[in-house]
Amino acid sequence: MRGILYFCTLILLEGMAEAVSSSRDCLQAGESCTNDPICSSKFRTLRQCIAGNGANKLGPDAKNQCRSTVTALLSSQLYGCKCKRGMKKEKHCLSVYWSIHHTLMEGMNVLESSPYEPFIRGFDYVRLASITAGSENEVTQVNRCLDAAKACNVDEMCQRLRTEYVSFCIRRLARADTCNRSKCHKALRKFFDRVPPEYTHELLFCPCEDTACAERRRQTIVPACSYESKEKPNCLAPLDSCRENYVCRSRYAEFQFNCQPSLQTASGCRRDSYAACLLAYTGIIGSPITPNYIDNSTSSIAPWCTCNASGNRQEECESFLHLFTDNVCLQNAIQAFGNGTYLNAATAPSISPTTQMYKQERNANRAAATLSENIFEHLQPTKVAGEERLLRGSTRLSSETSSPAAPCHQAASLLQLWLPPTLAVLSHFMM
């Protein structure tokens, strides 16, 4: 009965997610904007504003003009557009997204939106239901990590892409005792983007009770090439490198968004979705900030870096590192996957809150409030009187593009109102 209810819940969630994610993607929005003289002109201006991070070097007048441009584009088809993870021309799509959001989000450590559509990928419902249907004892009595490897070898795509990334990651460069990390990372991203989660999640998050199992799990991403190096760099180096790349910046933003910890929810996740958190986690594997299990004796996860010698960016560095090492949402999601309850996030967190988690909660709330003020400050009539001409110029854009998007926003609102009670009822029957 429990497995059947999970099965029904998954189908329901995917159907609703697809309905909500039917909004315009940023590639389409960019093409529409290019074909509109008014939008196209403002978009070119915005590109100039953020070129080479030049916004920090602009004078007051130039900054005001850039703010005016952003304000006008808030009512265009560009604002609110999303991208799909692993889509064709993903980098191009994300460049359009960040052209708008780079300005709005500048200085924010915690993002209040994800560049990607809230899409639940095609899970194998029968397989997942069978895994989660048994009791916790039944799940942990078998070697799930070994079973995961066997299951991947049976599936053609999983076996082929796994063999491909392992081949790239273990291959040594000629006349050097190092691997080609760039090719290794690219092959890893391809694997986690294309192979269904019922295989990738089982390989990464399988529960272990002995070191042999835990070592197999740790070796999943071939850490000698994809993760480790002779010395641990300061975390700010890979973080800065990530922010300079559209794809990595977006995957990290999705991870922040979907794995954001909270002390206000029973699950420990602000978004109350373990599945979304785990999927976001797999998205940053194969990036400059690739995380992994730190050893074969625990389930602790961290990127390969340290916050020593961070200077005046010490707090920023520690906030980044603690998103992995002290994140109740991520830790609970991994544990819930192990005992077969990760599809039902409405369970009490098994990890006690720490001082750092309280600090993360305060920072998240502060960032959310500041972000809201920054965006809507530009929209107050008393503050945009001088920009009336620009806003008038965008009237046609607003009337043409805001209406089609309205059903998507309404659907999202209805989903937020309807989904929690529905899951609560389902979880009641699963007990």
Swiss-Prot record:
Residues 1-19 form the signal peptide. It holds the Pfam family GDNF. Disulfide bonds: none annotated. Residues 404-431 form a propeptide. Its main location: membrane. It is a lipid-anchor; GPI-anchor. Keywords: Cell membrane, Glycoprotein, GPI-anchor, Lipoprotein, Membrane, Receptor, Signal. The keyword Glycoprotein applies. A lipid is attached at residue 403 (GPI-anchor amidated serine). Belongs to the GDNFR family. This is GDNF family receptor alpha-4. It comes from Gallus gallus (Chicken). The gene is GFRA4.
